[in-house]
UniProtKB/Swiss-Prot annotation:
<comment type="similarity">
    <text>Belongs to the scoloptoxin-10 family.</text>
</comment>
<keyword id="KW-1015">Disulfide bond</keyword>
<dbReference type="GO" id="GO:0090729">
    <property type="term" value="F:toxin activity"/>
</dbReference>
<keyword id="KW-0732">Signal</keyword>
<keyword id="KW-0800">Toxin</keyword>
<feature type="signal peptide">
    <location>
        <begin position="1"/>
        <end position="26"/>
    </location>
</feature>
<dbReference type="GO" id="GO:0005576">
    <property type="term" value="C:extracellular region"/>
</dbReference>
<keyword id="KW-0964">Secreted</keyword>
<protein>
    <recommendedName>
        <fullName>U-scoloptoxin(10)-Cw3a</fullName>
    </recommendedName>
</protein>
Length: 74
């Protein structure tokens, strides 16, 4: 009985960990695609870069202040 229970617990832990890791990897891949799209869109604006924190094109001096005004969403 203990062996069956142990196999079940191991199977559950491995499956659960795999699902969690898959979700984390999906978030990372999706975020990288968003950042890449934002960077491509910002190339068309003069003196602008993509702010990774909020995915907006910001004038270079405002880049790290989250574009309080004038930020253009991707």
């Amino acid at each position: 009985m203990r062996a069956i229970f142990a196999i079940f617990v191991i199977f559950f832990v491995v499956l659960h960990t795999d699902l969690i890791m898959t979700g984390i990897l999906a978030d990372v891949i999706y975020t990288e695609k968003e950042i890449a799209a934002c960077g491509r869109n910002c190339k068309h604006l003069p003196n602008s870069r993509c702010n990774v924190a909020n995915r907006k094109c910001c004038p270079v001096p405002q880049l790290f202040s989250n574009c309080p005004k004038g930020g253009r969403v991707k």
